Amino acid sequence: PVYYPFSMVIDDNDRRLINVPLIKGDEKYTIDFEGIERAIIEENVTLFLLCNPHNPVGRVWTENELKRLGDICIKHNVLIVSDEIHADFVWEGHTHKVFADLGESYAEHCIVSTAPSKTFNIAGLQVSNIFIPNDSLRRRFIKEIDRAGYSQLNTMGIVGCEGAYK
């Protein structure tokens, strides 16, 4: 299982979805690391979409799981886009770990997206945050945003976001 709009975004951008299902255990879902690495190699994967924590299964990935996944992606030069919109919704006894905070090499190979929409129930304001630690990648991202015509900021969304986080 995965958040279904991921596949829609992939299709809308004329990209091909390479699916590696989670492994369903008796008590929790786990990541199929071997399957992911095999798919990366066999399918020439260049971008990995990570749902951290996972939606809809609710798994909060451990630091070791995230590092293992990151190590695989770094080894094969795969960019990780970590959707961390549900970071504030974790089970008691668990702690969300921001992917970019795992260390410099992980930060250099990722984009982290967050939003106040889930936590504060303000999805209608259509605002999100994109964190790109890698300067070169950030410049490329900004260039693509400009090229696509997203030059106008949502003023109400920014005010709502700022108020929610205060």
Predicted regions and their residues:
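Aromatic/hydrophobic pocket-lining residues that form π-stacking "cages" and hydrophobic walls in ligand
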Residues: F6, L69, F99
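Structural detector of well-ordered beta-strand residues that form the stable sheet scaffold
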Residues: I18, V81, I111-S113
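A short helix->loop->beta-strand "cap" motif at the edges of active sites that frequently abuts
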Residues: R15, K75-L79, A107-E108
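Active-site phosphate-binding strand-loop segment of PLP-dependent enzymes
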Residues: L22-H94
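Substrate-binding/gating loop at the entrance of the active-site cleft, primarily
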Residues: P1-L17
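PLP-dependent aminotransferase class I/II
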Residues: H109-K166
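Hydrophobic/aromatic ligand-binding patch that stacks against planar heteroaromatic rings
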Residues: M8-I10, I72, L102
